[in-house]
């Protein structure tokens, strides 16, 4: 794997500005304004997001042991870990960016069970400790591009998904990989109430083609900024596919199933004209309601310092992944 050529020191994203909002999307889906008026003290105004010290600190995750392969490092300095995860997209805990940090402490991540099933010769079940001990962990500094036209760079910690799938031995019938988030309404208020959860159908589901899942860039992620993932960021394990829009990065995964047919995915079910199965970052294919040609890079500065920059095809990973889609119409298969 060649060294990523698109990252430079100034690209590293401040942890205090990790996520942004998708309220416009929910309005388009017909979700009532009541969903945006939840009586929660954590519903801060957007400007407070840039103040840094006003955001609740991330829950302390345990330090992880991991390597730092040179191909993914670029010697980039990182923002202190106590500013991570102030704003998140995790609708199971509410729509506002402050809601997951405020509410995700209710999620019990240990014990945890992750099952790998379907078109495999050797079905597997992993427990909480397996996620951080069974595979060598490595830190990878990846660009992350949200479908909402903002971007950042994050040092994820995890292991390539292909290593896990190889243990399960996919059969010749396996063509796709389906992922599912835990369904725990008693712990996740957004799964109990459609207004809190944005009207989505739960549990959250995602999917990849098998060749996408087996690509070396695709990461099963268990940590960020040197420590185990906090619950609002998808603990104990989430998916990162850096050349795709962020909603493909399903959180708190309990099931991975290899299938013959293309699996359903949550945002595609909710709005198929707006969110495709592939969700590859593409500056030439706009969202129906906004351009994808440029993006707001979110760094450590204030609101006036947010810079707009050109969106890179496949989020800057075209050299590594473009061959996966040779001959595929990327406008039709968005």
Curated annotation (Swiss-Prot):
Q: What is its EC number?
A: 1.8.5.-
Please give the catalytic activity noted in the UniProt record.
Answer: L-methionyl-[protein] + a quinone + H2O = L-methionyl-(S)-S-oxide-[protein] + a quinol; L-methionyl-[protein] + a quinone + H2O = L-methionyl-(R)-S-oxide-[protein] + a quinol
One Pfam family name from the record?
Answer: Oxidored_molyb
What would be one Gene Ontology cellular-component term for the protein? periplasmic space
* Swiss-Prot/TrEMBL cofactor(s): Mo-molybdopterin
Q: Which residues bind Mo-molybdopterin?
A: 88, 91-92, 146, 181, 233, 238, 249-251
Sorted alphabetically, the Gene Ontology BP terms of this entry are:
protein repair
Q: Where in the cell is it found?
A: Periplasm
Which note does the record give on the cofactor?
Answer: Binds 1 Mo-molybdopterin (Mo-MPT) cofactor per subunit.
> What keywords are annotated for this sequence in UniProt?
Metal-binding, Molybdenum, Oxidoreductase, Periplasm, Signal
* Gene3D superfamilies (alphabetical): Oxidoreductase, molybdopterin-binding domain (3.90.420.10)
Which Gene Ontology MF annotations are present? metal ion binding; molybdopterin cofactor binding; oxidoreductase activity, acting on a sulfur group of donors, quinone or similar compound as acceptor
Query: For this UniProt entry, which residues form the secretion signal?
Result: 1-44
The record describes its quaternary structure and partners as: Heterodimer of a catalytic subunit (MsrP) and a heme-binding subunit (MsrQ).
Q: What is this protein called?
A: Protein-methionine-sulfoxide reductase catalytic subunit MsrP
Q: Which organism is it from?
A: Escherichia coli O7:K1 (strain IAI39 / ExPEC)
- Gene that codes for this? msrP
């Amino acid at each position: 794997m060649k060294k990523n050529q698109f990252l430079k020191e100034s690209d590293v994203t401040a942890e205090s500005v990790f996520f942004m909002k998708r309220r416009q999307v929910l309005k388009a889906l017909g979700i009532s304004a009541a969903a945006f008026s939840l009586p929660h003290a954590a519903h801060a105004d957007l400007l407070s997001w840039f103040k840094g010290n006003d955001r609740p600190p991330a829950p302390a995750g345990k330090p992880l042991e991991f390597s730092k392969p040179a191909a993914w490092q670029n010697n980039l300095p990182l923002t202190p870990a106590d500013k991570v995860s102030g704003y998140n997209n995790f609708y199971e805990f509410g729509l506002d960016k402050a809601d997951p940090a405020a509410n995700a402490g209710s999620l019990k991540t240990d014990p945890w069970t992750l099952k790998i099933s379907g078109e495999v010769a050797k079905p597997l079940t992993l427990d909480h400790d397996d996620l951080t001990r069974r595979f060598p962990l490595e830190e990878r500094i990846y660009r992350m591009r949200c479908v909402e036209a903002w971007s950042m760079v994050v040092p994820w910690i995890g292991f390539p998904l292909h290593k896990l799938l190889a243990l399960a031995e996919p059969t010749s019938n396996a063509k796709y990989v389906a992922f599912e988030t835990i369904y725990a309404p008693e712990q996740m208020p957004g799964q109990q109430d459609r207004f809190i959860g944005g009207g989505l159908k739960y549990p959250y589901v995602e999917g990849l083609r098998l060749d996408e899942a087996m690509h070396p860039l695709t990461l099963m992620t268990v940590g960020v900024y040197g420590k185990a993932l906090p619950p609002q960021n998808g603990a104990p394990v989430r998916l990162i596919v850096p050349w795709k829009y962020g909603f493909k990065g399903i959180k708190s995964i309990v099931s991975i199933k290899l299938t013959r047919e293309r699996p359903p995915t949550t945002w595609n079910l909710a709005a198929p004209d707006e969110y495709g199965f592939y969700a590859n970052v593409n500056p030439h294919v706009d969202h129906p309601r906004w351009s994808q040609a440029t993006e707001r890079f979110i760094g450590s500065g204030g609101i006036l310092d947010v810079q707009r920059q050109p969106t890179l095809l496949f989020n800057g990973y075209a050299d590594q992944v473009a061959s996966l889609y040779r001959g595929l119409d990327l406008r039709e298969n968005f």
